[in-house]
């Protein structure tokens, strides 16, 4: 019979604000440690930066431009040898708004 839990759970988190992201990571780490699972990470992944340049006025002044950038911060967590209790606790966990979570079992 195949067990419901695998050898590890890989959690990838993304957010625009690194402070909210770090709060979410600490909540996940605390929850996993309370259930007795070992944790590898959090591993900071490279920040994705996308820059956009637009003209300030519509028809005149080509030299007058404005630049905007958007940063996406990422973290990676591995929960090693999770128990069923760990999986249930992570399922009930509520994370801050603005954090994208990808979970691979």
Curated annotation (Swiss-Prot):
Q: Which GO molecular-function terms appear in the entry?
A: structural constituent of ribosome; tRNA binding
* Pfam families to which the protein is assigned, alphabetical: Ribosomal_S10
**Which residue pairs form cystines in this protein?**
none
* Matches recorded under SUPFAM superfamilies: Ribosomal protein S10
- In its keyword annotation, does this UniProt entry include rRNA-binding? no
GO BP terms, alphabetized: translation
In the record, the note on similarity to other proteins reads: Belongs to the universal ribosomal protein uS10 family.
Matching entries from HAMAP family are given as: Ribosomal_uS10
Self-association or partners: how does it assemble?
Part of the 30S ribosomal subunit.
Q: What is this protein called?
A: Small ribosomal subunit protein uS10
UniProt lists the gene as: rpsJ
